């Protein structure tokens, strides 16, 4: 079994969520009572990973601070006997989990962001989790499915894994995957035969499958990333490096189990907020009544 480290690229500027993200990192936008990045870290930890590397930017100090210990806050909560809140704050970074930071000096793309993590990862396999795609943990147990299942399959086969989902409609803003066999049920795996970042003419691909922002990558991806030239949007794309790797060895796509929300865009963020709000143990019932009242007006 391989002990993998996870990379979370958080250096992006959150353009789709402006003006909210002008001064607040998109990863710190709340989904009810936790910032988006917390759901991502919780998923990674549930999959068994203990070392997490945040690739950050000078404007992302709030993300780094979120996972740091706030002695003043913890002391205040203890003095006021706010035990539940204190426990929640202390669980932000679980015991035994190490969260490190490295800076991406220039916005040169996701592939470049991953390369910035190489000194900390070394020439080893690793996991990449994009911070703006939240997988609903009530729709799929994170201890068993999706990232956890990808890691298990990687440990079994040694092949790189990409999580995928069906997305009928316009795929021009996404990473589109074509597989050898149809991904016709949750959890099914098939070899990737084509992988394109934000295709100009997605209708020319016989596929409605897109990447969901979860990758388990063998060490063979490093030379491909080093050779990758700027692609879509003038950026070094991880997708392009994986596509080259898939020409040389088997790279698997796994169809996601459950639901996900693209919280880097307004519609996905609103959907996630409502979904998590409705099942919030403390305020969910009131929230539901409030929404029902608004819809009836």
Curated annotation (Swiss-Prot):
Name of the protein in question: UTP--glucose-1-phosphate uridylyltransferase
Entry EC no(s): 2.7.7.9
Record's keyword annotation contains Transferase: yes
GO biological process, one term: UDP-alpha-D-glucose metabolic process
Catalysed reaction, written as an equation: alpha-D-glucose 1-phosphate + UTP + H(+) = UDP-alpha-D-glucose + diphosphate
Record family assignment: Belongs to the UDPGP type 2 family.
Transmembrane domains' residue ranges: none
Enzyme class of the recorded protein, top EC level: transferase
This protein's UniProt keywords: Lipopolysaccharide biosynthesis, Nucleotidyltransferase, Transferase
Keyword Nucleotidyltransferase attributed: yes
Organism: Shigella flexneri
Any GO MF annotation of the entry: UTP:glucose-1-phosphate uridylyltransferase activity
Alphabetical list of PANTHER family matching this protein: UTP--GLUCOSE-1-PHOSPHATE URIDYLYLTRANSFERASE (PTHR43197:SF2)
Record pathway: Carbohydrate metabolism; nucleotide-sugar metabolism; Bacterial outer membrane biogenesis; lipopolysaccharide biosynthesis
NCBIfam families associated with the record: galF, PRK10122.1
Alphabetical list of Pfam families matching this protein: NTP_transferase (PF00483)
